[in-house]
Structures are given as structure tokens and as C-alpha cells.
Amino acid sequence: MIKTIAIVVVVLLVVSLAGVLLLAVSKPDTFRVQRTTSVKAPPDRIFPLIADFHGWSAWSPYEKLDPAMKRTFSGADKGKGAVYEWDSDGKAGKGRMEITDAPAPSKVTIKLDFFKPFESHNTAEFKLEPRGDTTELTWAMYGPNLFIGKVMGIFFDMDKMIGKDFETGLANLKTLAEQKPIDATTSRR
């Protein structure tokens, strides 16, 4: 009787594992998370807040994950070539961002590398499109959907998880940009 139960349990585990693996391989090879908001400010008021990593602490939800994380800035002061690295024992992990393209005031493209808690290499992109007296501001992240990401996608809705952070960040940017005109350097720590 115990032998039969053990066999049934093993078979159920194998079938469950096979099901998870089949679901994982059926997931797309790339991912994209994107959120958009409308900001009552011109692109040239929003752009400096994004193109200068020193000012991200004023609006990025990721900056609040671990106030004690180590931050390093290198490369250009802002815009193309600016580099921001972080190292955290907490939720923020360890990673690096480098602005690879920043045609003012329409777009900022960032090479985004995570090293901890898992390694991944993606692209983050901010687009600023004037729409009359407002700016349509889009924050996107995209890249390869590796096998571990496909498996995680079965159990967690990554779009909702990351998208919620993007919505918070965009709302913070909107609030900052709709205030009096500011210079991103005034918000530096």
C-alpha cells in the first residue's frame, strides 16, 4: 500500500513538473512591460529628471527599496554615457544602468543590468511625446525572456509587478514636472 502511494506521488510530481516545463517553453522569448501617463508639462521640463541619474531619488520607486544601498555614479554627469550602479543587501539587489541614447527632449534609452538576486540584461526606455499642452510619457522595459523568467511568469504576473512600480514612478515624475520648473541638479543628495 505504501509503495503504491509513493509511486502515485512520484508520478504526480513528474507530471506536474512536465506541465510546468511545457508551460514555460510555450512563453514568448522576449518580454515588454510598459506604462504611459499624460503630464501637463513640456518634454524639456521632464527630460532632465530622467536623463540625470542623480535626480532619480526624487521620483524612482526603486530608490526607496533600500535607503542604505550603496550608490555609485560615473561616466558622463548626465545624458548619454551616464552610469549609475547600486548594491543592496535588501530588495534592490545589485545592478548597473547606463544611458546609451538621450536625444533631448524626446527619449532616454538605458542599458539595464541586474547582477543580484538574479542576472538579467534588459533595456529601459522613456519616451516623451508632446501632445498640445501635455506630454505623453512612456516608461518601458524589454529584453530576452530567459527560461527562468518563463518559469517565474507561470507563478507571478511580472507585468503587474513591474508595471505597478512604473505607474508609481510615472506618477512621481508627473507630480515633479507639473510643479514649478526645476533643475534635476537641485534634487541631488
Feature map (PLM): residue ranges:
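N-terminal post-signal-peptidase region of extra-cytosolic proteins
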Residues: 70, 81-84, 110-113, 123-124
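Beta-strand/loop substructures that line and gate deep hydrophobic ligand-binding cavities in soluble
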Residues: 4, 101, 111-167, 173-175
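Sec/Tat-exported extracytoplasmic proteins
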Residues: 50-60, 88, 166, 170, ...
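Extracytoplasmic/periplasmic/luminal assembly and interaction segments
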Residues: 52-101, 151-152
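Generic structural detector for well-ordered beta-strands
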Residues: 36-40, 85-87, 98, 109-111, ...
